[in-house]
Amino acid sequence: MKTEGIKSPSAKYHDMAGSQRIPHKNPHIQKVAVLQSKPNKEDALNLIKEIAHKVSYLMKENHFKVTNLVEFYPRDQRLLGMNVNHGSKIMLRLRCSTDEFQFLPMECIMGTMLHELTHNLFGPHDKKFYNKLDELIGRQWVIEQRGLYDTFLGNGQRLGGRANLRSNRYPMTGISTNTGIVRKRGKGVKLGSLHPEGISSIDRGNSPRELAAFAAERRYRDDRWCGETKNNKDQIISDNISSSLEVVILDDDDEVLPGDTLIEVIDLT
């Protein structure tokens, strides 16, 4: 079943990319979904599939499993992501809180994804959590430089093999070379980082008191931006499956029933 959506400036590019069967797979994520009520949902779907694709090798190395990776657009404008039941569902904000037509920079969404994957292992924003998050951030950078993905890429690429680096790199803001999605320029905020400009890296020359202050600031920021510490988690999840959205399951044998959830679901396995 197909639904009609608002055509975006990148629709022509998107159709070309689809005809070339550019892979966006991840054997460690069962399904991805985007909000049907928002504009440019095809671009949103391509974006969340790109995120899933890029973390596939990291997830393989760390034995991470995610059942559903979905877009959400919470009422709390500060909220960037949420992990439900250690990977049962990871929800990511893809769009600017003040303009749903604009997508966040890739580095911002990727930072949130790594943060939420860390919640598969650790709940509280404590030292163990941040040690693991920093490890994942550093490892993901190396993986992207080497162009590693845990998926069949076609053209002779094997599971866990390398991809063409030039065709899979993406800029930190602006236009993605894979999807053609126009993303908002400017500074984004990444979960787990002290500054919007980059990954948290504290000078080893700082005093213990300064390091403690940095750590406290990091926890404070993440407690605001991450859904893990929210007292209204059930309400946030409920808002994301409002009856105003329509389910589109990519199986012609299935019928859409009244009252079904609101998300377009794509099987990544």
Swiss-Prot record:
Q: Does the keyword DNA damage apply?
A: yes
Q: Which segment of this protein is annotated as the motif SUMO interaction motif 1 (SIM)? A: 247-254
Q: What is this protein called?
A: DNA-dependent metalloprotease WSS1
Please provide, alphabetically and separated by semicolons, the GO molecular function terms listed in this UniProt record. Answer: metal ion binding; metalloendopeptidase activity; metallopeptidase activity; SUMO binding; SUMO ligase activity
In which residues does the motif VCP-interaction motif (VIM) occur? 209-219
Q: Which cofactor does it need?
A: Zn(2+)
Q: What happens when the gene is disrupted?
A: Accumulates DPCs and exhibits gross chromosomal rearrangements.
Q: What is known of its domains?
A: The SHP box and the VCP-interaction motif (VIM) are important both together for binding to CDC48. The 2 SUMO interaction motifs (SIM) are each important for binding to SMT3(SUMO).
